[in-house]
Curated annotation (Swiss-Prot):
Cofactor binding mode and count: Binds 1 Ca(2+) ion.
Major localization listed first in the record, in broad terms: secreted
Protein name: Basic myotoxic phospholipase A2 PhTX-II
Pfam family, one: Phospholip_A2_1
CC per GO annotation: extracellular region
Molecular-function GO terms, alphabetical: calcium ion binding; calcium-dependent phospholipase A2 activity; phospholipid binding; toxin activity
Positions with a binding annotation for Ca(2+): Y27, G29, G31, D49
GO biological process: arachidonate secretion; lipid catabolic process; negative regulation of T cell proliferation; phospholipid metabolic process
Length: 123
């Protein structure tokens, strides 16, 4: 669920997903193609896309159980799909925090899709 993912990102980075991550680089936001631009785009967004891609048949909009306690994001018990999607989102939010030092606000925020050329990377 995008609202839950945004809360995870905000908790880990202090930044709202929109505008900071939804249109960042070539893989943050919907879909992606070309070469990832930096660690945030590659390690976080591209890997998140791959994580979701492995979950065919799982609805990405469903609300999943999770908690924010003692500074940690914990995915709760739910359906198999809910648990897996939560783990994808949790890993990406943590990745964003771990790669804040490479986040390029002036170079890749609102990066135009037209500059993402070439085939999509393989997971």
């Amino acid at each position: 669920n995008l609202l839950q993912f945004n809360k995870m990102i905000l908790k880990e980075t202090g930044k709202n997903a929109i505008p900071f991550y939804a249109f960042y680089g070539c893989y943050c936001g919907w879909g992606g193609r070309g070469k990832p631009k930096d660690k945030t785009d590659d390690r976080c967004c591209f890997v998140h896309d791959c994580c979701y891609g492995k979950l065919t048949g799982c609805p990405k909009w469903d609300i999943y159980p999770y908690s924010l306690k003692s500074g940690y994001i914990t995915c709760g018990k739910g359906t198999w799909c809910e648990e897996q999607i939560c783990e994808c989102d949790r890993a990406a939010a943590i990745c964003f925090r771990e790669n804040l030092d490479t986040y390029n606000k002036y170079g890749y925020m609102f990066y135009p899709d037209s500059r993402c050329k070439g085939p999509s990377e393989q997971c």
